[in-house]
């Protein structure tokens, strides 16, 4: 299983992701999210669907949506007549729902001119390919044609299907409405939900447990992102009251190294009768976020127990899909270069439910991320090796410490959604090298896999195209 007895399961995914939601169909968990590239909110990465059968080992292959070039900047003229450049962006996919053998994805698209809305896409499989249900999709600025219509002209649309089959959608700024029977349109006028706390809010979630409707809404943002909730015994749109106890049920835990637990989703696991909250974490600030998951617990009156987020996470929800010993854990890694450390200093409100006057409960915290080669063998999705920005031919080498027969290597690259090419070499003595595997065409997947490597003591991975970094390098006999 794992040589690291105290293994942490947060961060959940080996990539920078935000706004996660999870659905389970058959024996597979599907995770949807916003792909972060550290370019700010003006540009996002290629959207993908991460899949797992055990909630620990996650992978993806390619994108579930075609017809967009996410890396292309489009020129447009804004309302003030200024020339600008912008990108298509895919944000905050809601929980995918199944109806009559079709899968419905509600997701925010932002156009290059920053016009945005929540759209519904449909597919025959939960991992796509997904298509717009009407119109020609979304057209670049200046192109003739008809854009597909949005369900709502705002962001963070999140669907909810009640026990009687009626559908609802919730979006930012506490807005909500009924969905038509075909799930494609609003039915009637939207409403605004009254919450106990004021202030800007996004990333809403609705779920139902034992006859109680729970409306989760975010407050603040960045390192002070929190999740608050209201309860109703009436309906998804009415009767909400402030719960007893901490209505902000999830907030930063600096002692556990979790900052700004924000926009997320609730996943109910029927197999274990558990509720799991998935959420984004601050990372290094901006769009360097990562996905965390922790179990939710409830009091007898239905209120949510304050969730103290941690690195431990959830762990396996089904039998582990990887039982082979990972040779990397006993091996020595070194690289052509290592990126300089990155330090963040933030002020965090440590008591958001009852802040002390004059910012008395605001404290300063520091975190530093390093990018050493050894990070690729620590069973953590939150640490990585990255080559220096000036390194024009980056590589990373492993010494297995003795000659082993290697059957498979798995490479979990950084920014995997943007694609990589690479070359793998092997050596018995560390001096004479021969190529044993190659990815010559740009491929976006995680992990990349090299097989049938044979006897060797040393392996050297050259990253030819794509981001020069690895979250993990797993090695099996």
Question: Where would I find each of the regions flagged by the language model?
Answer:
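Disordered, acidic Ser/Thr/Pro-rich linker "stalks" and the adjacent N-terminal cap
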Residues: 315-402, 412-418, 438, 474
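Short aromatic loop motif centered on NTY/YTY
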Residues: 146-148, 262-265
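Short, surface-exposed coil-to-beta transition loops
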Residues: 116, 260-262, 289, 419-421
């Amino acid at each position: 299983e794992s040589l690291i007895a105290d293994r942490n399961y947060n961060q959940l995914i080996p990539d920078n992701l935000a706004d996660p939601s999870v659905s389970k169909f058959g024996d597979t968990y599907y995770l949807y999210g916003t792909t972060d590239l550290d370019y700010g909110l003006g540009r996002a990465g290629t959207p993908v669907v991460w899949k797992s059968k055990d909630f620990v080992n996650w992978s993806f292959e390619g994108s579930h949506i075609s017809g967009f070039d996410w890396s292309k900047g489009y020129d447009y003229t804004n309302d003030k007549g200024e020339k600008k450049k912008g990108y298509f962006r895919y944000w905050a996919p809601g929980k995918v729902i199944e109806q009559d053998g079709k899968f419905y994805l509600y997701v925010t698209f932002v156009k290059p001119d920053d016009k945005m809305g929540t759209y519904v896409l449909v597919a025959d499989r939960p991992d796509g390919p997904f298509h717009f249900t009407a119109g020609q999709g979304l057209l670049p600025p200046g192109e003739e044609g008809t854009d597909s219509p949005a369900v709502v002209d705002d962001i963070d649309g999140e669907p909810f299907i009640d026990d009687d089959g009626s559908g609802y959608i919730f979006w930012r700024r506490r807005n909500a409405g009924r969905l038509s029977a075909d799930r494609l349109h609003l039915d009637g006028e939207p409403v605004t939900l009254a919450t106990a706390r004021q202030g800007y809010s996004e990333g809403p979630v609705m779920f139902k447990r034992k006859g109680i409707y729970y409306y989760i809404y975010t407050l603040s943002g960045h390192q002070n992102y929190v999740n608050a909730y209201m309860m109703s015994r009436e309906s998804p749109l009415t009767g909400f009251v402030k719960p007893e106890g901490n209505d902000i049920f999830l907030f930063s835990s600096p002692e556990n190294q979790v900052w700004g637990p924000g926009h997320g989703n609730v996943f109910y696991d029927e197999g274990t009768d558990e509720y799991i909250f998935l959420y984004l974490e601050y990372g290094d600030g901006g769009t360097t976020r990562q996905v965390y998951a922790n179990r939710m617990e409830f009091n007898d009156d239905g209120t949510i127990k304050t969730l103290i987020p941690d690195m431990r996470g959830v762990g396996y929800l089904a039998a582990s899909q990887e039982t082979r010993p990972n040779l990397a854990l006993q091996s020595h890694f070194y690289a052509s270069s290592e990126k300089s450390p990155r330090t963040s200093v933030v002020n965090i409100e440590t008591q958001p439910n009852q802040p002390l006057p004059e910012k008395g409960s605001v404290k300063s915290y520091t975190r530093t991320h390093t990018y050493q080669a050894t990070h690729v063998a620590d069973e953590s999705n939150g640490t990585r090796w990255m080559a220096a920005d000036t390194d024009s031919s980056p590589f990373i080498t492993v010494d297995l410490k003795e000659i082993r027969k290697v059957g498979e290597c798995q490479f979990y690259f950084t920014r995997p959604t943007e694609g990589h090419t690479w070359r793998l070499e092997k050596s018995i003595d560390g001096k004479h090298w021969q190529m044993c595997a190659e990815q010559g065409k740009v491929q976006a997947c995680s992990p990349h896999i090299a097989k049938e490597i044979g006897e060797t003591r040393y392996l050297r991975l050259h990253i030819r195209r794509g981001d020069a970094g690895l979250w993990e390098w797993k090695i099996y006999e």
